[in-house]
């Protein structure tokens, strides 16, 4: 299970540049082969610590999902018998969902959300709890034909095979709902549109992961009946709420 290499793997490939430092004290590098290497801070290193050993085990389980259609899981864990150094995976490019271009057309956005929801369903049925999933960990890349939407920073995704799959699915869908609504229509909670009982009911169902956020957005578009000769964009929707 999982792929593990020692630190010589990084030394042999070589580091091209430092990409950034995270607020958790980790450092992100781009390697000479184009991959991303996340080097963990000292807090994660010591494998005599049971919490760090569990963290490494979870990361190794994630490598079994490398190549997932939506989620950018690591390919390799860099470790020794005593130390956990970091993880290597694909360097994903794109714009965080929170900073999505408001001129993107709604039809395109809904297509992306459909793909995202299918990926969430797939990974939830396998028993994954996608902790720390939020609007800054979802990347949009309209230029890419193969990976226009990706979930990154999966360190705290946890495989929970003992959990009910429907419960996991709804938990993960609640996170997706929060990320999308926060990014696309953050003002909806203050809007008069939720005074419509039918809209409010659909909103509550979607916010609890009972129905898909894409279905809620399509229902919302149906209810507000936006009239425009131009392609409908996120900005148009925001102004109509």
Name the predicted role of every residue range:
Residues 12-73, 77, 100-102:
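ATP-binding glycine-rich loop module of kinase domains
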Residues 120-142:
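Catalytic-loop of the protein kinase fold
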Residues 29, 115-116, 138, 148, ...:
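Hydrophobic transmembrane helix bundles of membrane-integrated enzymes that assemble
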Residues 143-241:
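C-lobe/activation-segment region of protein kinase-like
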Residues 1-16:
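A short, low-complexity linker immediately N-terminal to eukaryotic Hanks-type protein kinase catalytic domains
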Residues 69-112:
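Conserved structural core of kinase catalytic domains
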Residues 106-125:
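Amphipathic alpha-helical segments that line or abut small-molecule/effector binding pockets
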């Amino acid at each position: 299970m999982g792929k593990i290499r020692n630190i010589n793997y990084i030394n042999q490939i070589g580091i091209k540049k430092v990409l950034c430092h995270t607020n958790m004290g980790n450092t992100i590098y781009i390697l000479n082969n184009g991959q991303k290497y996340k080097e963990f801070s000292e807090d994660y290193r010591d494998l005599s610590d049971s919490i760090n050993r569990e963290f490494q085990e979870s990361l190794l389980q994630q490598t079994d999902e490398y190549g997932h259609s939506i989620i950018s899981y690591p390919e390799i864990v860099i470790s020794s018998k005593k130390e956990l150094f970091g993880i290597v995976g694909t360097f994903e490019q794109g714009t965080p969902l929170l900073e999505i271009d408001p001129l993107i057309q709604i039809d395109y956005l809904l297509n992306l959300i459909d793909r995202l929801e299918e990926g969430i369903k797939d990974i939830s049925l396998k028993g994954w709890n996608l902790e720390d999933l939020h609007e800054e960990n979802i990347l949009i890349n309209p230029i890419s034909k193969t990976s226009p939407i990706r979930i990154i920073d999966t360190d705290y995704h946890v495989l929970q095979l003992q959990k009910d799959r429907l419960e996991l699915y709804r938990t993960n869908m609640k996170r997706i709902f929060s990320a999308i609504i926060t990014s696309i229509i953050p003002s909806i909670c203050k809007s008069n549109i939720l005074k419509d009982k039918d809209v409010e009911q659909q909103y509550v169902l979607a916010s609890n992961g009972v129905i898909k956020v894409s279905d809620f957005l399509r229902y919302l578009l149906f209810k507000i009946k936006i009239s425009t000769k131009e392609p409908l964009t996120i900005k148009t929707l925001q102004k109509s709420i």
